[in-house]
Amino acid sequence: MNRFLLPGGVFLLLVIVLFIGIQRAPQKTVIPSALLGKPAPQFTLPVLGSNESFSSASLAGRWHAINVWGTWCPECRVEHDMLLRIADSGALPLIGFNWKDQDEAALGWLDQLGNPYSVVVADRDGREAIDWG
């Protein structure tokens, strides 16, 4: 019986310390974005599947949503239906940043699942999307 008292006591002490630590921890931690209040980054990128380029200058004065996605990204597949619904509603134009992907794979993905974007740019090296946070 005595051989269980010490380990049991240590375990109980650890549970109490953990419980007190959880109770004293802040409930919500918000890390402010360094990009808030700053102008949107400028970019000029090739349009996916085209020889044309697209510049952020053409977006000036209007609201748009920028979505960074890739065919290799499981979360992108999950959110894709929601993006299609947003596009169908016409509430907000969507600009797609295809990030670090192969053009053929990205075009096939959009053909298969639908294209919610008014324009899709190919951010092949991934540098432009990083500027957007």
Residue ranges: model-predicted function:
Residues 25-27, 46-52, 119-123:
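Short gly/ser/thr-rich secondary-structure transition/capping motifs
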Residues 3-4, 111-116, 123-133:
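Thiol/disulfide oxidoreductase modules built on the thioredoxin-like
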Residues 43-65, 70:
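A short beta-strand-turn-helix
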Residues 68-85:
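Conserved redox-active cysteine motifs that mediate thiol-disulfide chemistry
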Residues 85, 104-112:
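Short alpha-helix adjacent to the SAM-binding motif of class I
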Residues 1-46:
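N-terminal targeting signals for export/organelle localization
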Residues 92-105, 115-126:
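Thiol-based oxidoreductase modules, predominantly thioredoxin-like and allied folds used
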